């Protein structure tokens, strides 16, 4: 078996058939760029940001994803997140497994309903020196609202605000399949 490295690795999987288990979420595949966004929470000032989201596969029962966001005006890098969206074969159960650049890892589980996904955190881990407040709960939705339009909404609760509140909303346009 050849050893694959760097870009050759991702290029080599472009013709791999999609795993049967993830056909229910193949509508996510591709590269998406934000066209509208907002961030808010009771403890911060509202803001806008830009983001690119990429969903790909390598023939396994999961999609790989990455989210890269930056400040709307300055272009300064903000949030980075990467992980997997894994489907329990033969079901509509899905798990969202992510690592984030500010020291948080999440496991969210939920269901796929048509062209929508509803998730809720089951485990949130954080590095010992992450700054407060502590995120204690996350709920996330993905919804394909038109053939090339995807929306994501993220709700959260923290050690300071224990009720789940909307934190992020973004509408993406597909820019590459």
Tell where the protein language model's regions lie, with residue ranges.
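Short, surface-exposed beta-strand-loop junctions and turns on beta-sheet-rich folds
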Residues: 71-72, 102-104, 125-126, 158-159
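A structural detector for short beta-strand units
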Residues: 51, 81-83, 106-108, 138-140, ...
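A short secondary-structure junction signal
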Residues: 107-109, 131, 152-155, 164-166
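Short hydrophobic/aromatic-rich beta-strand segments that constitute the beta-sheet cores
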Residues: 34, 63-67, 93-98, 117-121, ...
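A short, structured loop/turn motif at beta-sheet edges
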Residues: 55-61, 86-92, 110-117, 143-149, ...
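Helix-adjacent hinge/juxtasegments
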Residues: 72-111
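Amphipathic/hydrophobic helical signal segments and adjacent flexible N-terminal regions
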Residues: 2-62, 66-77, 137, 147, ...
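Acidic, glycine-rich flexible loop segments
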Residues: 103-104, 118-139
């Amino acid at each position: 078996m050849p050893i694959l490295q760097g870009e050759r690795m991702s290029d080599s999987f472009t013709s791999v058939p999609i795993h049967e288990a993830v056909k229910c979420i193949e509508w996510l595949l591709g590269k998406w760029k934000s066209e509208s966004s907002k961030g808010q929470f009771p403890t911060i000032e509202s803001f806008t940001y830009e983001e690119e989201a990429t969903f790909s596969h390598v023939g396994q029962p999961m999609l790989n994803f990455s989210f890269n966001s930056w400040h709307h005006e300055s272009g300064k890098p903000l949030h980075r997140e990467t992980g997997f969206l894994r489907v329990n074969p033969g079901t509509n159960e899905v798990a969202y497994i992510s690592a984030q650049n500010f020291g948080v890892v999440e496991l969210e589980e939920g269901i796929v309903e048509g062209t929508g996904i509803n998730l809720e955190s089951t485990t949130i881990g954080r590095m010992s020196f992450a700054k407060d407040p502590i995120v204690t709960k996350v709920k996330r939705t993905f919804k394909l609202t038109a053939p090339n339009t995807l929306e994501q909404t993220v709700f959260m609760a923290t050690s300071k605000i224990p009720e789940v509140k909307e934190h992020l909303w973004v509408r993406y346009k597909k820019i590459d399949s």
